[in-house]
Structure formats: structure tokens, C-alpha cells
């Protein structure tokens, strides 16, 4: 048997109440001194409602207390005693169940608090991951937009490259055609007007000097005379544009200058006594005739 207030094992003396509960002597004194209420059913108790009992009576007390009692009363007393015992066991089981339920409730509260904290952490992590996913989606969208722009730029650059390749091929073909036309045979050149070397002979023959009349047809002394034959002026090469063949050759545009000044009669090469026409003709055949030379710096005359 256990006390219904402190649930300790009862040994020896105990206190029984009229409401059917069993208390130890210490708890009974506390109840009487405080509010005088039963801790189980809250019934008001007084000293008349309590009675001391012996939880472990000896044989002498059992024989003396049961002597002279009818069996009906004994059976009734035994029934009440058994019901009291069953009630005490039920109270004891209920106390144990309440204690276990309290412990389980406490554990559940601790687990609930722990899992609530974990759930909050998971929810916080989920919110962070959701924000990160949004940022990643925006980054993917920006990268897709950049990829599309780069593809458009690449297509434009490819189109420009194809156009440049076509222009390069066209210029290369034009250059090859110009190169082939530049190495054409000499019969395609324009003829250049040759100066008349004997244009001044009649004027010389009309001179009053008989010596000059005899030597009027003689050519000049072999050798170069810069004062008589000046080199033709150089044609300025235009640097304003590429080489064009459609504008015409330099020989076609400007004819070489011809010296039309009257030449001075040359001195006789074979002596001063040669006054006849046969000697002059002989000297003309023997002596080389000076012809104008082309300048190396003159541009090529071709079509």
C-alpha cells in the first residue's frame, strides 16, 4: 500500500479517510494543519473523518478484532476491504500513468522545440535557396540574352567576312587582268613621233658662207651634247588612286617634245678642204646618227 499524497510505501501506522483514501501520518498532519482537503478528491476533511489504521497487524489483533462478528458482517467487511484495495491499486496505476504521461509530454515538448528549431533552420535554408535560384534564373536569362547578341554579332561578322572575301577575289581578278594586259606584245604600244633630224638643213644651205654650204648636210660630232638634246621631262605619277589602265598610256596622253631649234652646223670631222657634196654624203654615211634615247624613268607606255 502507498500514500495517496506522496506515494511512498506505507509501513506500520497510516490514516484512512471516509472518502476511501489512505494517507501517511505526515501528510495527514499537513492536510489538517493547512486547508483540510483531500489531495485526491478535494473533499473537506476533519479529524473525525480520519482514522488511524495498522497496515501490518499481528495475529493477536486479527483474532481479537474478528471475534464475535457474524459471517455476514465479516463478508461485508471483506468486500469493502477488497474494494478499498482495488481502489488503491487503481489510484496507484493512475498516478503511474500520469507520471509517465507527464514524462512523455515533457519529452514531446522537448522534441517539438527541437524539431521546431530544425524546421525553422530548414525553412531559412529553403528561403536562401529560393533566392539563390531566382538569382541563378536571372543569370541564366542574362547569359541567354548575351548568347543571342553574340550569335547576332557573329552572323554579322561572318557576313562582313564573306563580303570582304568577295571584294578581295574581285580585286585579285582585276589585278591579274591588269598584270596580263601589262605584259602584252610590243605591237600594242602606241607609236611615238620621231624628230626630223634634217629639218634645219635648208636653212643651213641658205647661209652665205661657202664653207657652211658645203658642210650643211653633215651630222653632229659623235657624242652626247646636253645643250642640243635635253632629256624629256618626267611625267608626274599620280598617287591619288590605284593603278588604272583605262585612263590611257603616258605616250598616248602626251607626245615627247621635239627640238625644233635650228642647230648649229657641226665642225668638219675629216678636215676643212671637203667642200663637195660627195664628201659630205660619205661623212654622213660613216658617222653614226644620234637618235633620242628613252629615259629609264619614263613610265611604261602601254594600253
Curated annotation (Swiss-Prot):
It comes from the Eukaryota. GO terms for biological process: chiasma assembly; homologous chromosome pairing at meiosis; protein ubiquitination; reciprocal meiotic recombination. Ubiquitin E3 ligase required for class I crossover (CO) formation during meiosis. It comes from Oryza sativa subsp. japonica (Rice). Expressed in young panicles. This is E3 ubiquitin-protein ligase CCNB1IP1 homolog. Its main location: nucleus. SUPFAM superfamilies: Myosin rod fragments, RING/U-box. It catalyses: S-ubiquitinyl-[E2 ubiquitin-conjugating enzyme]-L-cysteine + [acceptor protein]-L-lysine = [E2 ubiquitin-conjugating enzyme]-L-cysteine + N(6)-ubiquitinyl-[acceptor protein]-L-lysine. Disruption phenotype: The mutants hei10-1 and hei10-2 have normal vegetative growth but exhibited complete sterility, due to shrunken and inviable pollen as well as sterile female gametes. Reduced chiasma frequency, with a random distribution among cells of remaining chiasmata, but normal early recombination events and synaptonemal complex (SC) formation. Pathway: Protein modification; protein ubiquitination. Its EC number is 2.3.2.27. The gene is HEI10. GO terms for cellular component: chiasma; chromosome.
Amino acid at each position: 500500500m502507498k500514500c495517496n499524497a506522496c506515494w511512498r510505501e506505507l509501513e506500520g501506522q497510516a490514516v484512512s479517510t471516509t472518502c476511501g483514501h489512505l494517507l501517511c501520518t505526515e501528510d495527514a498532519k499537513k492536510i489538517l494543519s493547512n486547508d483540510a482537503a483531500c489531495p485526491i478528491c478535494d473533499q473537506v476533511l476533519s479529524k473525525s473523518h480520519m482514522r488511524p489504521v495498522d497496515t501490518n497487524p499481528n495475529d493477536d489483533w486479527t483474532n481479537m478484532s474478528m471475534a464475535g462478528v457474524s459471517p455476514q458482517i465479516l463478508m461485508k467487511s471483506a468486500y469493502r476491504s477488497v474494494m478499498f484495495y482495488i481502489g488503491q491499486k487503481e489510484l496507484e496505476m493512475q498516478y503511474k500513468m500520469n507520471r509517465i504521461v507527464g514524462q512523455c509530454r515533457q519529452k514531446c515538448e522537448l522534441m517539438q522545440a527541437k524539431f521546431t528549431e530544425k524546421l525553422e533552420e530548414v525553412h531559412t535554408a529553403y528561403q536562401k535557396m529560393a533566392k539563390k535560384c531566382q538569382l541563378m534564373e536571372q543569370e541564366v536569362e542574362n547569359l541567354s540574352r548575351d548568347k543571342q547578341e553574340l550569335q547576332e554579332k557573329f552572323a554579322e561578322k561572318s557576313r562582313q567576312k564573306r563580303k570582304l572575301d568577295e571584294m578581295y577575289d574581285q580585286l585579285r581578278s582585276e589585278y591579274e587582268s591588269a598584270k596580263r594586259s601589262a605584259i602584252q606584245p610590243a605591237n600594242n604600244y602606241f607609236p611615238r613621233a620621231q624628230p626630223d633630224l634634217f629639218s634645219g638643213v635648208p636653212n643651213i644651205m641658205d647661209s652665205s658662207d661657202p664653207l657652211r654650204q658645203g658642210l650643211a648636210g653633215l651630222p653632229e660630232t659623235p657624242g652626247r651634247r646636253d645643250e642640243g638634246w635635253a632629256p624629256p621631262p618626267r611625267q608626274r605619277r599620280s598617287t591619288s588612286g590605284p593603278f588604272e589602265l583605262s585612263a590611257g598610256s603616258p605616250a598616248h596622253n602626251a607626245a615627247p617634245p621635239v627640238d625644233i631649234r635650228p642647230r648649229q652646223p657641226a665642225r668638219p670631222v675629216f678636215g676643212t678642204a671637203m667642200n663637195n657634196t660627195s664628201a659630205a654624203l660619205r661623212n654622213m654615211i660613216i658617222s653614226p646618227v644620234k637618235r633620242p634615247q628613252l629615259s629609264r624613268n619614263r613610265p611604261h607606255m602601254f594600253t
